[in-house]
UniProtKB/Swiss-Prot annotation:
One Gene Ontology CC term in the entry: cytosol
Molecular function in Gene Ontology: ATP binding; glutamate 5-kinase activity; RNA binding
The organism of origin for this protein: Dictyoglomus turgidum (strain DSM 6724 / Z-1310)
Domain PUA residues, every copy: 274-352
Name of the coding gene: proB
Pathway: Amino-acid biosynthesis; L-proline biosynthesis; L-glutamate 5-semialdehyde from L-glutamate: step 1/2
Protein's UniProt name: Glutamate 5-kinase
Entry superkingdom: Bacteria
Length: 371
């Protein structure tokens, strides 16, 4: 284990609320003490905290029974203020400054905003300020929702080049089976690769806080070369034991040996594909087996509307996504030159054109096992 300097810690709602679902001052104080301990040990810390909606229910009880989106967003708007009051009051006891950052998926999909957010985090961390992060539920309609704070914490960890992501939960780690159902369930202490067997253990269904989202979070960070630890939140001094004492706790997800550079990682996990390009088997082999750029001649079909510089998905003729990349052509241009060779393209577009639709430096394979 390395000497981790920059750590992202994610806590779920159950880790900071009481049995009635209301924010627990005792639990939050315990978390605050742990965070301060890390800062005083010269660590840099980002805290991704759920609990806004639960905090809102405490204040506006008549909305708490409604399940519609506007009610949830109203609860989040009220609850986020209440949650930050808890954190502000308790961190102030230790004279520890904090900041609030609310994000949507759109903030991370847009490359310029992504870089700007990274720089904001950088400045806060340099000043020993703890950013407290949550999804901006009040404005996050379905199209721009990140969806869960496990995923959010993983994307934040990648954006700031963290050394470690710690997800604190109500379970000790990843088990071989559901420990609530099977007495034969065993704690998996080490995960070296997130393959189909690990994803199967995590279960189906893309819930907003279950084991599936935690394993997907691990997949995001490990592909960026960042390890992740999944551990139980209510274990005494859990962060000190993990970060400072380097104790073996919970499940440790090891970083991928062939992890992606930051740009390609952003393309695969952050950017939203604006269209689809379908390619023939020859072009597929060139991408997967020979590491080549994508040329117009291998393209069979173009779907969607996109402009130069957008991220697009690349599919084979069987409908399987094989890669993503940044296109040199917009969808109208590409539709004109698909399947054409260089001379034919010159006759269509003139002398000013790109030989590659997507250069290999701007292309990343979606199935990392193909690398």
């Amino acid at each position: 284990m390395n000497n981790w300097k920059r750590i992202v810690v994610k806590v779920g709602t159950s880790s900071i609320t009481d049995g009635r679902g209301s924010p627990s001052g005792e639990k939050i104080l315990s978390l605050v003490k742990e965070c301060v301990k890390l800062i005083r040990a010269d660590k840099e810390l980002v805290l991704v905290s759920s609990g806004a909606i639960a905090s809102g229910r405490e204040i506006i009880q008549k909305l708490s029974k409604r399940k519609d989106l506007p009610a949830k967003q109203a609860l989040s708007a009220v609850g986020q203020v209440r949650l930050m009051q808890y954190y502000s009051q308790l961190f102030s006891i230790f004279k520890q400054p904090i900041a609030q950052i609310l994000l949507t998926a759109e903030d991370l999909r847009d490359r310029k905003r992504y870089i700007n957010i990274s720089q904001t985090f950088e400045t806060l961390l340099e000043e020993k300020i703890i950013p407290i992060v949550n999804e901006n539920d009040t404005v996050a309609v379905e199209e721009i929702k990140i969806g869960d704070n496990d995923t959010l914490s993983a994307k934040v960890a990648c954006a700031i080049n963290a050394d470690l992501l710690v997800i604190l939960s109500d379970v000790e780690g990843l088990y071989s089976e559901d420990p609530n159902i099977s007495s034969n369930a065993l704690l998996i202490t080490d995960v070296y690769e997130i393959d189909e067997s690990i994803e199967k253990i995590a279960g189906p269904g893309k819930g907003t806080g279950g084991m599936f989202t935690k394993v997907q979070a691990a997949k995001i960070v490990t592909e960026a070369g960042i390890p992740m630890i999944l551990a139980r939140a209510d274990v005494e001094n859990i962060l000190e034991r993990i970060v400072l004492k380097k104790e073996k706790v919970g499940t440790f997800f090891y970083p991928s040996e062939k992890h992606l550079n930051k740009r390609k990682h952003w393309m695969l996990f952050m950017a939203k594909p604006e269209g689809r390009i379908y390619i023939d088997d020859g072009a597929k082999d060139a991408l997967l087996k020979r590491g080549k750029s994508l040329l117009p001649v291998g393209i069979k079909k173009v779907e969607g509307e996109f402009t130069r510089g957008d991220t697009v998905s690349i599919f084979d003729l069987r409908g399987e996504e094989i890669a993503r990349g940044i296109t040199n052509y917009d969808s109208l241009e590409l539709d004109k030159i698909k399947g054409k060779n260089t001379e034919e393209i010159r006759n269509i577009l003139g002398e000013d054109f790109y030989e590659e639709v997507i250069h290999r430096n701007n292309l990343v394979l979606t199935n990392r096992g193909d690398l």
